[in-house]
Amino acid sequence: MSASEAQVIARALFDSLTGAALQALHTATSINGEVTTERLLAALPADAPREVRNLILALGKEGNLDRLPAVVAAFEQMTRRGGARPLTGEVTSAVELSPQQRERITEQLKARYGPDLEVRFSVDESLIGGLIIRIGDQVLDTSLRTRMAAIQRNMMTG
């Protein structure tokens, strides 16, 4: 399966799950009169996602049911954007990369992480050579500075 096919399937799943959650949340926030955890839960459709029920229970337990409409509005805004935040990659090199190098790196990263990946490039001469690529919480460090530091540690320890 290609990355683009996986993206299409993931988008369909995302739309389905968020659509059901939004519909259930809108139903819950449309009740009139006193807002209680019990009334909100009773207003939900039987097939409402478990996460929606858990959200209402958590807000009720903390006395924050009045904040549910704001949470729904924020969630709706996120789903319109297609998720929480687009994934961003930061590529740091020891020297300025050519447009062709940037394009090749961007293509390779998008093939692995999806077409919506935003890639930024920066220069840090202290790397001496190589690259450091950060995407989300993942870091790939092929810099000469890191390799030399590892050699130095190995020499010091034995």
UniProtKB/Swiss-Prot annotation:
GO cellular component, one term: proton-transporting ATP synthase complex
Keyword Iron: no
Main location: membrane
GO MF, any single term: proton-transporting ATP synthase activity, rotational mechanism
Subcellular location: Cell membrane
Keyword Cell membrane recorded: yes
Pfam families: OSCP (PF00213)
InterPro entries per record: ATPase_OSCP/d_CS (IPR020781), ATPase_OSCP/dsu (IPR000711)
Keywords tagged on the record: ATP synthesis, Cell membrane, CF(1), Hydrogen ion transport, Ion transport, Membrane, Transport
Topology within the bilayer: Peripheral membrane protein
Similarity annotation: Belongs to the ATPase delta chain family.
Function, as annotated: F(1)F(0) ATP synthase produces ATP from ADP in the presence of a proton or sodium gradient. F-type ATPases consist of two structural domains, F(1) containing the extramembraneous catalytic core and F(0) containing the membrane proton channel, linked together by a central stalk and a peripheral stalk. During catalysis, ATP synthesis in the catalytic domain of F(1) is coupled via a rotary mechanism of the central stalk subunits to proton translocation.
Complex formation: F-type ATPases have 2 components, F(1) - the catalytic core - and F(0) - the membrane proton channel. F(1) has five subunits: alpha(3), beta(3), gamma(1), delta(1), epsilon(1). F(0) has three main subunits: a(1), b(2) and c(10-14). The alpha and beta chains form an alternating ring which encloses part of the gamma chain. F(1) is attached to F(0) by a central stalk formed by the gamma and epsilon chains, while a peripheral stalk is formed by the delta and b chains.
Protein known as: ATP synthase subunit delta
Gene field: atpH
